[in-house]
Curated annotation (Swiss-Prot):
In-chain residues carrying the UniProt-annotated modification Phosphoserine: 47, 49, 51, 66, 76, 141, 199, 201, 229-230, 801, 819, 911, 913
Record-given protein name: DNA ligase 1
Organism: Homo sapiens
Record family assignment: Belongs to the ATP-dependent DNA ligase family.
PANTHER family listed in its UniProt record: DNA LIGASE 1, DNA LIGASE 1/3 FAMILY MEMBER
Resulting phenotype, residue 566 to K: In IMD96; loss of DNA ligase activity
Enzyme Commission number(s) from the entry: 6.5.1.1
Binding site for Mg(2+) 1: 621
Phosphothreonine modification, residue list: 195, 207, 233, 798
Residue ranges, compositional bias (Basic and acidic residues): 11-33
Length: 919
C-alpha cells in the first residue's frame, strides 16, 4: 500500500540519530558515488515498489544524467510540500550515521560537504517543502533575464530547487565560506531560494563554480543576508535592474534635454544671455516644456514690462537658434492661445475638472485638493505642490513645449458626452509627467489664466527682439547671436523699436501667427511685409473710436480738417470677406468666425456687388431689421438670434447690413487710403438693397447746429448716436487702433462721463424690501491687462426693471461660487452675499468718476493710494458679445477720469495728450 512521505522516512530517524560519529570515517569515499544497491537496502525498498516519488525522480534523472535512488531522495519531498510557517516550527534534524551512506547523502551533519569540498546544508530535506518539476518549468518559462545570463540560467534550471525558511537560511549562512554559491539575483515568482545540488560530479561542480565566479564579477554587490528570507526578495533585484536599465536610456528619449544645463537650472533672465551656450537643450532637440516654465517663473517674479519682454526674448532667441520648428508652439503657450482666433479653439476646462485631474494624478482625495485650492486661491500652485507627493517606478519622458501644446489642442477639439472624462485623462497624463513648476503653468494655461502680465503686444515685442538679435535661417553654430552688439544703448533701443514696428504693422494686417512665423523663419523680419500682406479670409482687428463728451470737443479735435458724421448703429460688427474663388467669410469684432451664424447674408452677397468685384473686405454693422415696419430693431432682439449652424429657413430675426468702410478690393489693400477715397470706392462698386444692404447714413458738415440736429435724428432712427471721422487728413484705416481720428458721440454723452463702461459682474447682494428673494445689487469690476486681474469698481443697483432683476437672478445663481476667483481683487469693497464666476459683462453708464480709497480699480494710475469708482452707475444692457478680458480696462477708466472737464481744468491738460492705444 502506498505510504505517506512522513511514514516513508520516519522509521529511519532513530537509526540516523545514533551514529553521528561515523560521518568522518566516510570522507575517504567521498570521491566515489555510493552503489545503488546500498542505497536501496538502506531505504528498505525496491525502486519499483511503493515509493511515492519514483516517477518524478526518474523523469528528473534523465535530465540530470545520474542514476539510482539518489535522485529519488532528492526529489521525493516535492509531493509533501508544506507552508513556510510549518517548516519554521520544525526542530533541527538529527545527523544521519548510516554506514552505508557516504557524505554526499548525509546532508544533516554540521561538517557535511560535497565531493569537491563545498559545505553542504544541515537541514533535513525530508521535512522541507519542495517544488514539483511542473513548478520549475513554469518558472523557467516566466524568466525574462537578459541574454547575457541565459547560459547560467539553463545550468541552474537542471538542478532541483528547494525552498528555505528564514531560520534555515540563517543556519546555512553560518556554515558557508566565501566561495559558496549564493542565491542568484534573477527574479522569481516564488520565495524559493536556490541551493547547491547535492549529487553532482566534480567536473560539473567545477564548471558551475566558474560560471558563478563570472557572475560574481558582473552582478551588483550582494544585498544584506536578511533580505534573502523576505517573501518578495526575488522581485527586488528585478526592480533595481529595471531602474538601472531605464536611467542610461532616459536621456536618449525624444524630448529629453541633453544640453549643457539641466532644464531645472535654466535662467533666461541672466545678464549677457547667450542663446546657444545658456540654453538647456541641444540643436535639433525639442524645446523642453520645463524651459518654458522656468521662463514663466522669471517673468512672474518681475513687474517691469521691459524686463519681462527681455526674458521672453532670450528664450525665443534660443528657440530660433536651436529648434526653429518649436517657435510657433512656444509663442502660443506664451500667449495662452491655441491658434488664430478664427479657428475658434478654446480649452474650456473649468476649475472643477482641473482639481479632479490633480486628485487622480497624484492619488490625493478630491476634497483635500479642493480645500487647498480654496486656501491658496491658485489651481496652479495646488497642482505643483500635489505633484511632489507622487512617486513613479518608471517616470514618463520629460514634457516638451510642442507636446504640451499638441495636448492642449486635443483637449479643445473634444466634444460630446464623454468629452469631460477624456479631457481628465489627457490632463492627468500631463500632470503625471510634470516636474518642478511645470504643473503650475499647465494648470493655469488650462484654466485660461496664465497670470503673467504678458499681453499680446509684449509677446510681439519679444518676438521682434529675438529675431532681430539672433536672425533665423543661420547654419549651426549661428555666426550672429547678438546683432545689436557694438551699438550704444540708445542706438540699440531705437533699432529694436524700428524692428518691432515692422512686426507690429504686419501683424495688424495679418493677425495670424500660423502664417507669419514660417515666413519669418525663412525670409527674416525685414522682408516679412513683402510676403505677409492683408488678404481676404484672415480677419482683422477693426479700427475703433474714442469717446467724446460733446460737439464742441469734436470741433476742437479736428480743427480745420474735413470730417463726416455717420449714424452709429446699435448692432454687431460684421467683417465681410469675399475670396477670389467666391467663398464668403464673416468675422466678428473679436475675429471669431460667424459665417455659420449668417447664412442669409452670404446668400445676398452676389447681388450687392458689381460683376467686376472679385474680392473684397467690407466693414459693416449687422442690425436687427423689422421688414414689416421697415425700421431698425433694438440690439436685444439681435441677441436672440441663434449663433451656430443656423438654417436659413428657420431664421426669425432678419438682419440688415450697414456698410461704412471698404478695406480691400480686387487684390488691393486700401488701409493706407484716406476715408474719402475708401468711401468713394465703396459706393461705386456695391449696390444698396433696402432691408438687406445699405450704406451708413452720413453728413459732411462743420456746422454745430447741423451736427446737433443730425445727432437728434440718429436717436429717432433707433441709433446710438454719431461716429465722427476725418475724411482726408490722418484718415487712414488704423487696424487694431482706438484712434482719435474716429470719435463717437452718443446721446448719453451730452451729460455725464462721456462714455459707457463694459464691466464684469463678480458678486451679488441679496435684495431687501420689494427685491427680497432675489438679487438687489451687484459688485462690478474692470479688467487690468497688466496683472490680469478683475478690480472692483462699483456697486450697481439701479437701471433694472423687475423683469430684468428676475432674469438676472435666474441666470446668475448658476454662477455662484463659495469664494472669489483668485484673480478677483476687491480690497475694501463691501463683500457680496454671493460670489459669482466672472463671466457676465454688463454695459453701465454713470454721472462721473471719482477717486476712491475703497475700490482698487486703476489704483496707482491716477493716485498712488486710491482707486477710481463710478458715481451713480446705471445698468444699460448685457454685452453678450464680450468676454471678461474684453471689458473696459483699468487704464481706460483712468483715461476717462482724466478727461472729465473738472479734472482737466484742475490739471490744465488737454485730452489730446492721451496716447492712442493699440488693443
Amino acid at each position: 500500500m502506498q505510504r505517506s512521505i512522513m511514514s516513508f522516512f520516519h522509521p529511519k530517524k532513530e537509526g540516523k540519530a545514533k551514529k553521528p560519529e561515523k560521518e568522518a570515517s566516510n570522507s575517504s569515499r567521498e570521491t566515489e558515488p555510493p552503489p545503488k544497491a546500498a542505497l536501496k537496502e538502506w531505504n528498505g525498498v525496491v525502486s519499483e515498489s511503493d515509493s511515492p516519488v519514483k516517477r518524478p525522480g526518474r523523469k528528473a534523472a534523465r535530465v540530470l544524467g545520474s542514476e539510482g535512488e539518489e535522485e529519488d531522495e532528492a526529489l521525493s519531498p516535492a509531493k509533501g510540500q508544506k507552508p513556510a510557517l510549518d517548516c519554521s516550527q520544525v526542530s533541527p534534524p538529527r545527523p544521519a550515521t548510516s554506514p552505508e551512506n557516504n557524505a554526499s547523502l548525509s546532508d544533516t551533519s554540521p561538517m557535511d560537504s560535497s565531493p569537491s569540498g563545498i559545505p553542504k546544508r544541515r537541514t533535513a530535506r525530508k521535512q522541507l517543502p519542495k517544488r514539483t518539476i511542473q513548478e520549475v518549468l513554469e518558472e523557467q518559462s516566466e524568466d525574462e533575464d537578459r541574454e547575457a545570463k541565459r547560459k547560467k540560467e539553463e545550468e541552474e534550471e537542471e538542478t532541483p530547487k528547494e525552498s528555505l525558511t528564514e531560520a534555515e537560511v540563517a543556519t546555512e549562512k553560518e556554515g558557508e565560506d566565501g566561495d559558496q554559491p549564493t542565491t542568484p539575483p534573477k527574479p522569481l515568482k516564488t520565495s524559493k531560494a536556490e541551493t547547491p545540488t547535492e549529487s553532482v560530479s566534480e567536473p560539473e561542480v567545477a564548471t558551475k563554480q566558474e560560471l558563478q565566479e563570472e557572475e560574481e564579477q558582473t552582478k551588483p554587490p550582494r544585498r544584506a543576508p536578511k533580505t534573502l528570507s523576505s517573501f518578495f526578495t526575488p522581485r527586488k533585484p528585478a526592480v533595481k535592474k529595471e531602474v538601472k536599465e531605464e536611467e542610461p536610456g532616459a536621456p536618449g528619449k525624444e524630448g529629453a534635454a541633453e544640453g549643457p544645463l539641466d532644464p531645472s537650472g535654466y535662467n533666461p533672465a541672466k545678464n549677457n544671455y547667450h542663446p546657444v551656450e545658456d540654453a538647456c537643450w541641444k540643436p535639433g532637440q525639442k524645446v523642453p516644456y520645463l524651459a518654458v516654465a522656468r521662463t514663466f517663473e522669471k517673468i512672474e517674479e518681475v513687474s517691469a514690462r521691459l524686463r519681462m519682454v527681455e526674458t521672453l526674448s532670450n528664450l525665443l532667441r534660443s528657440v530660433v537658434a536651436l529648434s526653429p520648428p518649436d517657435l510657433l508652439p512656444v509663442l502660443y503657450l506664451s500667449l495662452n492661445h491655441l491658434g488664430p482666433p478664427q479657428q475658434g479653439l478654446e480649452l474650456g476646462v473649468g476649475d472643477g475638472v482641473l482639481l479632479k485631474a490633480v486628485a487622480q494624478a497624484t492619488g490625493r482625495q478630491l476634497e483635500s485638493v479642493r480645500a487647498e485650492a480654496a486656501e491658496k486661491g491658485d489651481v496652479g500652485l495646488v497642482a505643483e505642490n500635489s505633484r511632489s507627493t507622487q512617486r513613479l517606478m518608471l517616470p514618463p519622458p520629460p514634457l516638451t513645449a510642442s507636446g504640451v501644446f499638441s495636448k492642449f489642442r486635443d483637449i479643445a477639439r473634444l466634444t460630446g458626452s464623454a468629452s469631460t472624462a477624456k479631457k481628465i485623462d489627457i490632463i492627468k497624463g500631463l500632470f503625471v509627467a510634470c516636474r518642478h513648476s511645470e504643473a503650475r503653468f499647465i494648470a493655469r494655461s488650462l484654466s485660461g489664466r496664465l497670470r503673467l502680465g504678458l499681453a499680446e503686444q509684449s509677446v510681439l515685442a519679444a518676438l521682434s527682439q529675438a529675431v532681430s538679435l539672433t536672425p533665423p535661417g543661420q547654419e549651426f553654430p549661428p555666426a550672429m547671436v547678438d546683432a545689436g552688439k557694438g551699438k550704444t544703448a540708445e542706438a540699440r533701443k531705437t533699432w529694436l523699436e524700428e524692428q518691432g514696428m515692422i512686426l507690429k504693422q504686419t501683424f495688424c494686417e495679418v493677425p495670424d501667427l500660423d502664417r507669419i512665423i514660417p515666413v519669418l523663419l525663412e525670409h527674416g523680419l525685414e522682408r516679412l511685409p513683402e510676403h505677409c500682406k492683408l488678404s481676404p479670409g484672415i480677419p482683422l482687428k477693426p479700427m475703433l473710436a474714442h469717446p467724446t463728451r460733446g460737439i464742441s470737443e469734436v470741433l476742437k479735435r479736428f480743427e480745420e480738417a474735413a470730417f463726416t458724421c455717420e449714424y452709429k448703429y446699435d448692432g454687431q460688427r460684421a467683417q465681410i470677406h469675399a475670396l477670389e474663388g467666391g467663398e464668403v467669410k464673416i468675422f466678428s469684432r473679436n475675429q471669431e468666425d460667424n459665417t455659420g451664424k449668417y447664412p442669409d447674408i452670404i446668400s445676398r452677397i452676389p447681388k450687392i456687388k458689381l460683376p467686376s468685384v472679385t474680392s473684397f473686405i467690407l466693414d459693416t454693422e449687422a442690425v436687427a431689421w423689422d421688414r414689416e415696419k421697415k425700421q431698425i430693431q433694438p440690439f436685444q432682439v439681435l441677441t436672440t438670434r441663434k449663433r451656430k449652424e443656423v438654417d436659413a429657413s428657420e431664421i426669425q430675426v432678419q438682419v440688415c447690413l450697414y456698410a461704412f468702410d471698404l478695406i480691400y478690393l480686387n487684390g488691393e489693400s486700401l488701409v493706407r487710403e484716406p476715408l474719402s477715397r475708401r468711401r468713394q470706392l465703396l459706393r461705386e462698386n456695391f449696390v444698396e438693397t433696402e432691408g438687406e444692404f445699405v450704406f451708413a447714413t452720413s453728413l459732411d458738415t462743420k456746422d454745430i447746429e447741423q451736427i446737433a440736429e443730425f445727432l437728434e435724428q440718429s436717436v429717432k432712427d433707433s441709433c446710438e448716436g454719431l461716429m465722427v471721422k476725418t475724411l482726408d487728413v490722418d484718415a487712414t484705416y488704423e487696424i487694431a487702433k482706438r484712434s482719435h481720428n474716429w470719435l463717437k458721440l452718443k446721446k448719453d454723452y451730452l451729460d455725464g462721463v462721456g462714455d459707457t463702461l463694459d464691466l464684469v459682474v463678480i458678486g451679488a447682494y441679496l435684495g431687501r424690501g420689494k427685491r427680497a428673494g432675489r438679487y438687489g445689487g451687484f459688485l462690478l469690476a474692470s479688467y487690468d491687462e497688466d496683472s490680469e486681474e478683475l478690480q472692483a469698481i462699483c456697486k450697481l443697483g439701479t437701471g433694472f426693471s423687475d423683469e430684468e432683476l428676475e432674469e438676472h437672478h435666474q441666470s446668475l445663481k448658476a454662477l455662484v461660487l463659495p469664494s472669489p476667483r483668485p484673480y478677483v481683487r476687491i480690497d475694501g469693497a463691501v463683500i457680496p452675499d454671493h460670489w459669482l464666476d466672472p463671466s457676465a459683462v454688463w454695459e453701465v453708464k454713470c454721472a462721473d468718476l471719482s477717486l476712491s480709497p475703497i475700490y482698487p480699480a486703476a489704483r496707482g494710475l491716477v493716485d498712488s493710494d486710491k482707486g477710481i469708482s463710478l458715481r451713480f452707475p446705471r445698468f444699460i444692457r448685457v454685452r453678450e458679445d464680450k468676454q471678461p478680458e474684453q471689458a473696459t480696462t483699468s487704464a481706460q477708466v483712468a483715461c476717462l477720469y482724466r478727461k472729465q472737464s473738472q479734472i482737466q481744468n484742475q490739471q490744465g491738460e488737454d485730452s489730446g495728450s492721451d496716447p492712442e492705444d493699440t488693443y
